[in-house]
Amino acid sequence: MRRAIELAARGLGSTSPNPVVGCVITDASGAVVGEGWHQRTGGPHAEVHALRAAGAAAHGGTAYVTLEPCNHTGRTGPCAQALAGAGITRVVYAVSDPNPQASGGGATLRAAGIDIAAGLLADEAEAGNAAWLTSVRLGRPHVTWKYAATLDGRSAAADGSSRWITSAESRADVHRLRAESDAVLVGGGTLRADDPHLAVRGVEGATQPLRIALDTRAALRPTARILDDAAPTLLVVGEDADTRHLPGVELLRLPLHDGRVGVHDLLTPLFRRGIRSVLLEGGPTLAGAFLEAGAVDRVIGYLAPALLGAGPAALADAGIENISDAQRLDITEAVRIGPDLRITAVPVPVTTSTATKEH
């Protein structure tokens, strides 16, 4: 199953709005005879690739799949039937399919006399498919907040300069994150301060994400780098914003509340558009708004071995006033990226947080 999870990760960035899935087939003796993963939207599913690789050796064998085999006919046929037709006698899957349109594959296989086991390495498989699972369960895109900071938590120096806090290795890793995401989002402050480009560079075969600029007053300059043709761009503005200086730019007009776009008011139309994962690269204010709205599902921080002592923090007001209200995180990974440290963490649900509140 761990190998199947590794295979599934190869589909990140190319299968959305569908899940990433990996499959390993063993023969009757337990030897691996076929592997596969879902490679692109509309293409054969992982089980089909693995069955093709296994051929006749799949008969009497076991299929290890990261997600419950689908039970519906879309652009491809149901994988549950493909497994049964190949003579597979046992199916082990990590995560049950929460999509009502495709779930039920386990029951179909069981009805066909196939032995079923679920839940093997479920946590690892869930983490690898977090974007799709979050979107199905919550009806909104999965959001990763990415930031870069010094060890004392500064995202820029006192004079506003921030290029470059982290190393070239960390910046290359960010391009990998972009390539795995459906969309990259920044706010007006970042647009004005950095004139970011946000397209993927240096990742072979990458699908360019949708670049989203949240600029309520449409103050974006027509010469902004985000408006070039390297990747698609969506400009999110207030309902009454004057955009006559930006002809040809795709717009999403949303109502403002106290001068701001509501986080969920933004995520809902993005989900309807087919966006399942958003990489939030905005500054501290936008990050704070998403955190306050409960819309940060993963945090990836690149920490540089440097100290500034002054300058803006990586996170601004998130509606937290007391230490007992702090958003606790579960660190899932800490690795060296060049001279920097990359920390990946997920929010701890309030109900299970170690923080205590006085009543």
Question: Model-flagged regions — what are they?
Answer:
Residues 1-16, 132-135:
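Short, basic/aromatic recognition patches
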Residues 4, 22, 70, 109, ...:
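Residue-level signal for inorganic ion chemistry
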Residues 20-30, 147-148, 343:
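Short beta-strand scaffold segments in enzyme catalytic cores
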Residues 24-124, 210, 289-291:
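Zn2+-dependent cytidine deaminase-like catalytic core
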Residues 98-101, 123-124, 192, 219-221, ...:
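Short gly/pro/ser/thr-enriched loop/turn and capping motifs at secondary-structure boundaries
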Residues 131-138, 142-277, 285-288:
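Active-site ligand-binding patch in enzyme domains
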Residues 293-329:
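Flexible, gly/pro- and Lys/Arg-enriched active-site loops
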Residues 318-359:
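Conserved histidine-centered catalytic loops in small-molecule metabolism enzymes
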